[in-house]
Amino acid sequence: MAQILPIRFQEHLQLQNLGINPANIGFSTLTMESDKFICIREKVGEQAQVVIIDMNDPSNPIRRPISADSAIMNPASKVIALKAGKTLQIFNIEMKSKMKAHTMTDDVTFWKWISLNTVALVTDNAVYHWSMEGESQPVKMFDRHSSLAGCQIINYRTDAKQKWLLLTGISAQQNRVVGAMQLYSVDRKVSQPIEGHAASFAQFKMEGNAEESTLFCFAVRGQAGGKLHIIEVGTPPTGNQPFPKKAVDVFFPPEAQNDFPVAMQISEKHDVVFLITKYGYIHLYDLETGTCIYMNRISGETIFVTAPHEATAGIIGVNRKGQVLSVCVEEENIIPYITNVLQNPDLALRMAVRNNLAGAEELFARKFNALFAQGNYSEAAKVAANAPKGILRTPDTIRRFQSVPAQPGQTSPLLQYFGILLDQGQLNKYESLELCRPVLQQGRKQLLEKWLKEDKLECSEELGDLVKSVDPTLALSVYLRANVPNKVIQCFAETGQVQKIVLYAKKVGYTPDWIFLLRNVMRISPDQGQQFAQMLVQDEEPLADITQIVDVFMEYNLIQQCTAFLLDALKNNRPSEGPLQTRLLEMNLMHAPQVADAILGNQMFTHYDRAHIAQLCEKAGLLQRALEHFTDLYDIKRAVVHTHLLNPEWLVNYFGSLSVEDSLECLRAMLSANIRQNLQICVQVASKYHEQLSTQSLIELFESFKSFEGLFYFLGSIVNFSQDPDVHFKYIQAACKTGQIKEVERICRESNCYDPERVKNFLKEAKLTDQLPLIIVCDRFDFVHDLVLYLYRNNLQKYIEIYVQKVNPSRLPVVIGGLLDVDCSEDVIKNLILVVRGQFSTDELVAEVEKRNRLKLLLPWLEARIHEGCEEPATHNALAKIYIDSNNNPERFLRENPYYDSRVVGKYCEKRDPHLACVAYERGQCDLELINVCNENSLFKSLSRYLVRRKDPELWGSVLLESNPYRRPLIDQVVQTALSETQDPEEVSVTVKAFMTADLPNELIELLEKIVLDNSVFSEHRNLQNLLILTAIKADRTRVMEYINRLDNYDAPDIANIAISNELFEEAFAIFRKFDVNTSAVQVLIEHIGNLDRAYEFAERCNEPAVWSQLAKAQLQKGMVKEAIDSYIKADDPSSYMEVVQAANTSGNWEELVKYLQMARKKARESYVETELIFALAKTNRLAELEEFINGPNNAHIQQVGDRCYDEKMYDAAKLLYNNVSNFGRLASTLVHLGEYQAAVDGARKANSTRTWKEVCFACVDGKEFRLAQMCGLHIVVHADELEELINYYQDRGYFEELITMLEAALGLERAHMGMFTELAILYSKFKPQKMREHLELFWSRVNIPKVLRAAEQAHLWAELVFLYDKYEEYDNAIITMMNHPTDAWKEGQFKDIITKVANVELYYRAIQFYLEFKPLLLNDLLMVLSPRLDHTRAVNYFSKVKQLPLVKPYLRSVQNHNNKSVNESLNNLFITEEDYQALRTSIDAYDNFDNISLAQRLEKHELIEFRRIAAYLFKGNNRWKQSVELCKKDSLYKDAMQYASESKDTELAEELLQWFLQEEKRECFGACLFTCYDLLRPDVVLETAWRHNIMDFAMPYFIQVMKEYLTKVDKLDASESLRKEEEQATETQPIVYGQPQLMLTAGPSVAVPPQAPFGYGYTAPPYGQPQPGFGYSM
C-alpha cells in the first residue's frame, strides 16, 4: 500500500504552453505578488510587452505593449505597478486609467506589494512605503544596514500590522551564497542585522493566551549547517505568556551541499511553516513546536518566486521551467501521518485540537475513556468538547455523563459538560434537547430565550414540540430556525398571522394546497381573494395553476377582478400562457371592447389565437386591431383601403410588417380605390419603405396611375439620399411636369448622380420657360459650347448674358469663343466683355481670341485695363503682342514695362524681331531662350557681354560645352571684347573659373596672358599667377620653367606639389631649392627622381638631421638595412624603430637588429623595443641572455613574445617565456608539442580553461594517451557547447570505446547536463545497442528526447523508440511504431496503456485492424480499453464488413449499455443466428434503440415459435396491436393474445378476440379473456354473446363482478354525500387552520384496480352543476 502523504501537490499550469518564452521565466522578468496573477515582461520582435495571467482564467493571458524595467500586479485587483528607470506608475487595467505616478531620486532595485494598497520600494540606501490612497508620496521607513551592501535584494516582508519590517538579500562569499537580513522595528526605530536566507511573520495564539503573538520565523544555511528559528518579536501583549524560542536543524541531503532556503510562507489556517530551497525541496514545520513534519523534493528546477495560496492555505510558486506549482496540507492525511509515520501522537493531538483536523479519533476516544474511567469527569468533558469535528459529541457521551450521579455541593458532570460546550459554541440537536428538557421543567424559560438569542442551541422539530406546550410564540421561533414548514404555518395560523403564510412558504419552498385555500378566502371576500390569488402568481413560477385560479373567479362571475388578476399574472407573456391570453381578450371583447383595445394597444401579449381575436376585433369595430392581426392578403386589402378610419402614422408603420409583394398590392388597391384620398398616405409609405419595395417598382406604380404629383413627392423624399441616376432623372422629369422649376434648378445644381447628357437633351426638348436648369447642367458638365449654340440659335441671347454675369463669369472665354464661331457681332462681344469685369481668366480669353486671329478686338479693353492700373501679366502680354504686331514703339515698351512675362513675349518676338526677343529675354533673365536666339542669329557679341555681366557659372558651363558649335566665336568675343571692357574683379573671376571648369586650358592661357603679362590692373594678382602656372602645367609644360623664373608672387609649396603630381620633378626641385625648403627638396630627389646618390650628396652638403632621417627612411625602404641604420644613427633618430624591426624581420638580419634595438633602448625605454629585443635574442638562440633579460626589470610584453615563439615553433623559448608569466594554458600547449603529456595535463589543471583542456585532450588522443585524455575530457564534457566537437574528434579517429568510457565516467559529475546523457544514448544506439534500454530507463528525463528519438529510429531500435515516444508524450507515434514493428516493439500492457492517451482517434481503428491481423484473441481486451472514446457505430460497421462480429461479441455486450443502434442490431442478429431467444428478449427489453418493425417483420417468419413470439411482442411495443394479436392467434399463444388485447385499450380488438375464441370453440379461453380484458368489454355485448352461444356459465363470474362494482359505487356516493354535508356544516363554524393533512375529494377513484380481487370500478361520477363550498373537484 502506498504511503499516505501529509501534503497535496498540484501543477496548475505550464507557462510555456501559454506562449511564454522560457528566456523570460526568471526572477528579473516574472513577478507573482499573490495567487491571483502572474506578470511577465517579454519582447516580441522589437516590441516590449507585459503578459498578465489571471489564475482564474489562465488560458486567456492579457498582453499589453508596455516598455518597463519591472511590473508587479496588485495582490487582489487588476492594478499594475510599472517601473521605468526612476519613474514609477500605477495603472488600473480595467478602468484603463493611471492612478498614481512618482519619480524617485535613486534607482529602485527591488519593490513589492506589502498590502492591497501599499508598495514597498527598496533603493541602494533606504526603504520606502508608497500608498495608493490620495496624493501621498513614498514615505521613507528606514535606512539600509551596511551588512546588505552589495547584496541582491530578493524579498521584503512585514507583519500584519506593518510594525515589523524585514529586508532580505543574498550575496556570493567564499564559494557559497550568504543570506543577509535587516529586521526593523517601526515603534522603536531600530534595526538588527541577521544572517538568514528566507523569513516570514505569523500571528499565533498560544493556549491560555488572550491575545495573538507576533512570531518571526527565519531560515539560514550557514557553514555549520541549516537552522530554522521561531521567535516572538516585541514585548508580549499584557496578560500573554511569552512564546518560547525555537531553533531546529534544517536537513539538507548530501547531494545538495550548495542548497539553501529561498522562500518561506506560513499557513495561518494550519499553523504550518512552508520552507522551499533553491534545489526545489519543500520542508513543513509545525509553527508552535518547530517540529519537522515532512520533507521532499517537488521540483527539479529552482522555484524563484512564491506566494500564499489562499484556496488551500498553502504555498504557490513558479520554477524556471515555467511550472506553476502549489503545495498545501492534506487535511485528511496529516494527523494519521504524524501519528503513524512520525510516531508523534502528542503533536497529532495538539494539531488536531488547535486546527480542528480529523484523523485523531482513536487517540481522543482512548484519552476520553481513560479520564472517564479515572473519574476525572471535568477533564473528560474538556476532551469530549475539544475533540475535532465533534467526534465525541454523541448521545452515548451524554448518556454516560447522565449516568454519573452528581456529588453534593458540586455541579453535575453533565452540566459541566454542557457548560464547556456552551462556552465553546453551539450545541447539537440531541444536546439541545437534553439540556432544555430539565430547564423547561424548572420553568426557566428565560434561559432558553437567552440561548436562542446567542445561537447556542441547534433548533429541531422535537425541540419546538417540547417548547410549544409552554410558549407557542417561542415555539414558532424554534420551528422557524429548525425549518419545519408545516409546523410554522400551523403556528402562524394559531397566532393570527395568516398574511405571512405565503411569504414564508415561498421563502422555505413549502407547497400547501393553494387552490383549496383560495376557495375558502374567495368565499369570505372576493377582494381579498383577488389579492391572495395575485400573491400566488406573483413569482416567475406560480404557486398554483393559473387556469384553476381563473376557474375559481369564473365560478363567481367576477369578470373585472379576473381581468385585473390575469393582466398581472400574464405580464411575463410566456408561450405556455397562450390559451389564457385568448380567454382574457375574448371575455373583454364580448363584454368590454374598450378594455380589450387598451390591452391590445399595450402589446402585452403575443401568444394568443391571433386569427380568432382578429375576427372578434373586426366585429367589435376595432379595425386597426383587426389589421394588426390579419395575415391573409384578402382580409388586409379589404380593411386597409378605409384610410379615413385609420391613424395615418400607424398605417405607415403597419406597412413595415408586410412583405414586399403584399405592400405593393395594398398600395395598388389604395390608389385604385380612391387616389385623391389615399395618395398622400401612399407617398408616405413609399418614402419610408422604398429600399425594401425597390424604387423602380414604386416609380412604375405611380407612373401606371399617371400620378406625376405622387411621383414628385415620393422621389423628392429620397432623391437627396439616392445614388441612382434613374431616380434623379425621373425626379427632374416629374418636377418639370408639375411646374416645380426651382426644384429642377436645385437638383441640377446639387446632384452628382444624374446622367448629364440625358438631362441636357431632356431639358432642350422640354422647352422650359426658364433656361436656368439647362444653363446649370451645361456649366457643370462642360457643355458650354453646345449651350451657346443652342441659346444663340433659339434667340435666347439674354440667357447668355445671364450665364456669364450671374451663373459663372469664369466661363466668359469659352462663351466668347462660341460667339465668334457663330459670327456674332463684335460690338455685342465687346459689350459682353466689358459687362463681365475681372472674374475670368485673361489668358484663356486671349487664347480663345488669338486662336481665331481676332486679337486686335481686345485692344481697347486691354488699354482700358492698364489705364485702370492692372498689373496682371496676361493683360500686358496681350498688349505687348499687339504693339509688336503693329510696330508701335515695341522696344521702349519691352524695356520699360515691368509686368509682362518675358518668356512669353520673347517667344512671340523670336521670329518677328530677334533683337526684341533678346531685349525681352535679358529683362527676364531667360538664359536658355536668349542663348538660343543669339546662336540662331549670330549675336555673339551681345551674348558674350550678357554672359560676363550675368556672372552665372552654370550658364557659362552650358555655353562652353564642347558640343556647342558656337563656342569658338563666342570665346573670341569674350577675349577680345567682353573682358577687355570690364573692370569688375568678380566678373573676371567668374569668367576664368568658367574656362577652368570647361577644361579649356589653351584658351585660358591665352586669356590669362592677356590679363597678367600685359601689365593690366590684375598683373600682380597672386591667384592669377598661380592659375597661369597651373594651367601651363596642365596644357603647355614647356612654358612652366619660364613662368617659375619670371613670376615671384605665387604659392611655391603648393605649386611645387602640383608639379610633382604632374611628374615635373626638376621644376619642383627648382622651386624648393629657390625657396630653401631642403627637406622637401631631398624628398623629391628620393621619392620622385629616385637618385639616392644625389640625395646622399645633398644630405652631406646640407648636413641637417631631418635630411638624414629622410635618407635613412628611403634606404630602409630600398632594403639597405645596414646603410639605413647608419643614417638613423647620424640623424640620432630612434623614432622609426617599428619600421626597422619589420625590415629586419623580413630580411632576417637579426644580429643587426639586436645592435639597433640596444641603441634605441638607451634613447627610449619603449615596451615595443624591449619586446622585439627579447624576440631577436630568441631568434639568435641566445637563451641565457634572454632568461637574464626577462628576469630583470623590463617593460616587455613577454606573453606576446611567447605566443610568437610558439607560432614559430620555438618551443624551448616559449616554455621559458610562458613559465615567466605563469600562462599555464599556453604552457600546457607548449609542453604538448614537446611531448611532455603529464606536465601538459598539470598545466591545463592550473589554467582550468576549456580551450586548454580541449587542446591537451586532443593531443593526448592523437598520442593515444587515453587515460590522460579522459582526465581532460571530463573537464570538457560539462560544457554543452564543447561536447559535440569532442565527440566528433573521438569518432573521426574511431575511438568509440574510449569515448563511451569517458561519457559513462562523466555522468556522475555534479555538472552533468542533458547533452552528456543525450550523446551517450546516441552512442549506445550506434555502437552498444544492448545498453541503450537500461540507460534510457535510468536517465530518460535527462536526455534530449527528440534527438535520441532520431538516433533510435536510425538504429532501428523500435522498442527503445516506443519507450521514448511514451516518455515524450507522443503517444500517436508510439502506437504507430508498435504496429509497424510488432515483433520488436509490441507489448500488450504497454500498448493498451498508451493507446488510451493518443490524440488521433483514427489510430483506434488502425489498432483494431492490427489486432485483428496479429492478435485476434486479445481483440476484445483492446476494445474494452478503447470503448470510452470509440465510435461504436463505426467499429460495428467495420467488423460487419470483415465478417468478424461473432469474434467481438463480448465487446458488443459490454458496450450495449450505451444503447447504440448499430450495437443493438448487431447483437440481435448474433442472437438470432445463435437461436438464443432468451438473450434476444433480454436485449430488446433493456435496449430499445433499433429498428423494431424491421426486426419484427424478420422474426415473424422465423421457424422457431419463440422468435415469432418475440415478433408479436415487438409489434405490441410499436402499437401494432392487431398484427401482434393475429400473430399470437396463428401460433396458438392465447395468453399473449389476451394480454396484448388488454394492453391495447381497444374495445373492438378485445371483442374480436372473444368472437375468435368462440369460433375456435375455446370456451375456457373465452372466460379467461373476460377476466383479462375486463375494463375494455361492454357488459351488454358480453351478455348478448354468452346468451347467443349458450355459455352463460363461463360468463357468470364476469357479471357478478360487474354487479358488485356498481353496488359499491352507489354505496360510496351515498357515503361521500353524507360526509360532504357534515364537512360543510363544520366549515361554516371553524376558522381556516392550515398545515393539517388536507382531504382532497374528487369525483371518484381514477385508478384502475386489477380485476383479480377485489374487482375494479369503471364508473365515474357526473360533475356537479354548481361548485360546492368546501369541495375540490376535477372534471
Curated annotation (Swiss-Prot):
List every stretch annotated WD40-like repeat 5. 196-257
Could you tell me which Pfam families the record lists for this protein? Clathrin (PF00637), Clathrin-link (PF09268), Clathrin_H_link (PF13838), Clathrin_propel (PF01394)
The region called WD40-like repeat 7 is annotated at 302-330
Which InterPro entries does this one have? ARM-type_fold, CHCR, Clathrin_H-chain/VPS_repeat, Clathrin_H-chain_linker_core, Clathrin_H-chain_N, Clathrin_H-chain_propeller_rpt, Clathrin_heavy_chain, TPR-like_helical_dom_sf
The disulfides recorded in the entry are none
State the source organism's domain of life. Answer: Eukaryota
Q: What does altering W1108R do?
A: In MRD56; uncertain significance
Region Heavy chain arm: what ranges? 524-1675
Q: Where is this region: Involved in binding clathrin light chain?
A: 1213-1522
**Looking at the record, which disorder is this protein connected with?**
Intellectual developmental disorder, autosomal dominant 56: A form of intellectual disability, a disorder characterized by significantly below average general intellectual functioning associated with impairments in adaptive behavior and manifested during the developmental period.
The entry describes its oligomerization and partners as: Clathrin triskelions, composed of 3 heavy chains and 3 light chains, are the basic subunits of the clathrin coat. In the presence of light chains, hub assembly is influenced by both the pH and the concentration of calcium. Interacts with HIP1. Interacts with DENND1A, DENND1B and DENND1C. May interact with OCRL. Interacts with ERBB2. Interacts with FKBP6.
Q: Which family does it belong to?
A: Belongs to the clathrin heavy chain family.
According to UniProt, the name of this protein is: Clathrin heavy chain 1
